[in-house]
């Protein structure tokens, strides 16, 4: 029997070595681009990996967030480099530092001497260079000062309650007659209707539906790779922004013309306030500033509220003991209402202590905002590591909100953990950010959520069609079926 001889071509080992060598060279490109210029200081960078040229670590980020375990992205960093709480990476087109602990996140968000807003250029192209995400610290303070009171002020919130409540009551009754429907989709329409009325006095269903569709496309592009080629989410998002800007420009131009002709409405909305406001030097906002503020507020003002309402409602229905406690609180508010008072008052919403715990726990569990972006204004030392000037810093809220040392059994929905005035340590609960860049519409958002849950708890129940439906995490945490469900009376 002839002896069988196995052989390997002489070029095969060379090809394998060549592949490994090429891989090593390619993986070093970002190191040469961003670390070499630091000289000896590069040795003080946090542990981590800058990934591939151009795409950096985005593939592993997107891969993790398209699974049922998005936290595997940072867990891999911790497993590979240890629980440092600070890691280098290349994210959204920039050399970056990811911080994952309450202490590091708090410092980054509150130290305005060391850090400034650092949103990626791709995000600013979508949200607007004159919005809160794209302007300097001084401009941010000015714009926030001019717009805060009309959004979050006591008088403004009291004025919004009747309109919010009227719409909530109407849609809840309507939904009981619709059979099966996408709960999240209709919640977003509700919250968009409310924010459109507050800002623009608009109640046109056609206009609202068209704009809301554009916002959906816009949001899918914010967390996507910045590939401006047809077929990619970012390209669709840029087209959506152009449509939104054109629509808002038309509205602003029409309102300015009405004011020139002295055609004034008895009702003042947010656009009127934006057209009227002047800073201490008498400077007003130009059209670009107004449009970017409108685009940002209308987006944040309906996306976060709609998603939070959906998850809070679902969590309440899944936890009967929590639901009963929250319902009892709302019934007590009704019993304590002064005779002759119709509808909720701001004072009553601030008595909803347990419901506020439900909302906070929902915000903690779902972590609506994945991260905030900052940029180092100078070389910064943190935890013994260097954050180089000009590098982006990402505060990773998901890790902060599931820290078991602060929140025992962190994956569990448990509003009772907030009992007895429990306040997490500074930086451990950041649903609206922190510091001077705290979300400017947070009080309005919580008011909307509380009013909806008040009426839902008193009369309604929700039954999901697919309770085991998979969850997607980009751009925001939601069921893939948009929470297909039925609403009925209790």
UniProtKB/Swiss-Prot annotation:
Membrane topology of this protein: Single-pass membrane protein
GO CC terms of this entry: endoplasmic reticulum; endoplasmic reticulum membrane
Pathway field: Plant hormone biosynthesis; gibberellin biosynthesis
Keywords from the named record: Endoplasmic reticulum, Heme, Iron, Membrane, Metal-binding, Monooxygenase, Oxidoreductase, Transmembrane, Transmembrane helix
Keyword check for Membrane: yes
InterPro entries: Cyt_P450 (IPR001128), Cyt_P450_B (IPR002397), Cyt_P450_CS (IPR017972), Cyt_P450_sf (IPR036396)
Main location: endoplasmic reticulum
Entry's EC annotation: 1.14.14.107
GO aspect biological process, one term: gibberellin biosynthetic process
SUPFAM superfamilies: Cytochrome P450
Subcellular location: Endoplasmic reticulum membrane
Chaperone among keywords: no
Reaction equations catalysed: ent-kaur-16-en-19-oate + 3 reduced [NADPH--hemoprotein reductase] + 3 O2 = gibberellin A12 + 3 oxidized [NADPH--hemoprotein reductase] + 4 H2O + 4 H(+); ent-kaur-16-en-19-oate + reduced [NADPH--hemoprotein reductase] + O2 = ent-7alpha-hydroxykaur-16-en-19-oate + oxidized [NADPH--hemoprotein reductase] + H2O + H(+); ent-7alpha-hydroxykaur-16-en-19-oate + reduced [NADPH--hemoprotein reductase] + O2 = gibberellin A12 aldehyde + oxidized [NADPH--hemoprotein reductase] + 2 H2O + H(+); gibberellin A12 aldehyde + reduced [NADPH--hemoprotein reductase] + O2 = gibberellin A12 + oxidized [NADPH--hemoprotein reductase] + H2O + 2 H(+)
Residues involved in heme binding: 439
Leading EC class: oxidoreductase
Cofactor: heme
GO molecular function: ent-kaurenoic acid monooxygenase activity; heme binding; iron ion binding
Tissue expression summary: Widely expressed. Highly expressed in influorescence stem, influorescence, and silique tissue. Weakly expressed in cauline and rosette leaves. Expressed at a higher level in stem and influorescence than AtKAO2/CYP88A4.
Family of this protein: Belongs to the cytochrome P450 family.
Primary role: Catalyzes three successive oxidations of ent-kaurenoic acid giving gibberellin 12 (GA12), a key step in gibberellins (GAs) biosynthesis. GAs, which are involved many processes, including stem elongation, play a central role in plant development.
Protein's name according to its UniProt entry: Ent-kaurenoic acid oxidase 1
């Amino acid at each position: 029997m002839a002896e069988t001889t196995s052989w390997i071509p002489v070029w095969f080992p060379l090809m394998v070595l060549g592949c490994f060598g090429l891989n090593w060279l390619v993986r070093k490109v970002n190191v040469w681009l961003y670390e070499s210029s630091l000289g000896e200081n590069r040795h003080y960078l946090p542990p981590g990996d800058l990934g591939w040229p151009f795409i950096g670590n985005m593939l592993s980020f997107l891969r993790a967030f398209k699974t049922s375990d998005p936290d595997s992205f940072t867990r891999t960093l911790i497993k590979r480099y240890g629980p440092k709480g600070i890691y280098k990476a290349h994210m959204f087109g920039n050399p970056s530092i990811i911080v994952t602990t309450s202490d590091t996140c708090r410092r980054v968000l509150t130290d305005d001497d060391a850090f400034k807003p650092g949103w990626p250029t791709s995000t600013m192209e979508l949200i607007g260079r004159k919005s809160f995400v794209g302007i300097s610290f001084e401009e941010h303070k000015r714009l926030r000062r001019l717009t805060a009171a009309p959004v979050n002020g006591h008088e403004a919130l009291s004025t919004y309650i009747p309109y919010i409540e009227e719409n909530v009551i109407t849609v809840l009754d309507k939904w009981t007659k619709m059979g099966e429907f996408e709960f999240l989709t209709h919640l977003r329409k509700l919250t968009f209707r409310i924010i459109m009325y507050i800002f623009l006095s608009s109640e046109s269903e056609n206009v609202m539906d068209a704009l809301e569709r554009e916002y959906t496309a816009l949001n899918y592009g914010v967390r996507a790779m910045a590939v401006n080629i047809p077929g990619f989410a970012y390209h669709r998002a840029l087209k959506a922004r152009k449509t939104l800007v054109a629509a808002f420009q038309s509205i602003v131009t029409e309102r300015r013309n009405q004011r020139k002709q002295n055609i004034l409405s008895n009702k003042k909305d947010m656009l009127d306030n934006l057209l009227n406001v002047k800073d201490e030097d008498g400077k007003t906002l130009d059209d670009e500033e107004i449009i970017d503020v409108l685009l940002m507020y209308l987006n944040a003002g309906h996306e976060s509220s709609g998603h939070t309402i959906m998850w809070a409602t679902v969590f309440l229905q899944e936890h009967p003991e929590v639901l009963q406690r929250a319902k009892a609180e709302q019934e007590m508010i009704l019993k304590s209402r002064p005779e002759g008072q119709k509808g909720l008052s701001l004072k009553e919403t601030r008595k909803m202590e347990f419901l506020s715990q439900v909302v906070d726990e929902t915000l903690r569990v779902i972590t609506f905002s994945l991260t905030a972006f900052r940029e180092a204004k100078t070389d910064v030392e943190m935890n013994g590591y260097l954050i180089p000037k000009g590098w982006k810093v990402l505060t990773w809220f998901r890790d902060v909100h599931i820290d078991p040392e602060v929140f025992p059994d962190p994956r569990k929905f448990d509003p009772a953990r907030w009992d007895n005035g429990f306040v997490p340590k500074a930086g451990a609960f950041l649903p609206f950010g922190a510091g001077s860049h705290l979300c400017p519409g947070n009080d309005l958002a919580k008011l909307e959520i509380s009013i909806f849950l008040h009426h839902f708890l008193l009369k309604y129940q929700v039954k999901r069609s697919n309770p085991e439906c998979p969850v997607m995490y980009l751009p925001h945490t939601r069921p893939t079926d948009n929470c297909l469900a039925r609403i009925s009376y209790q």
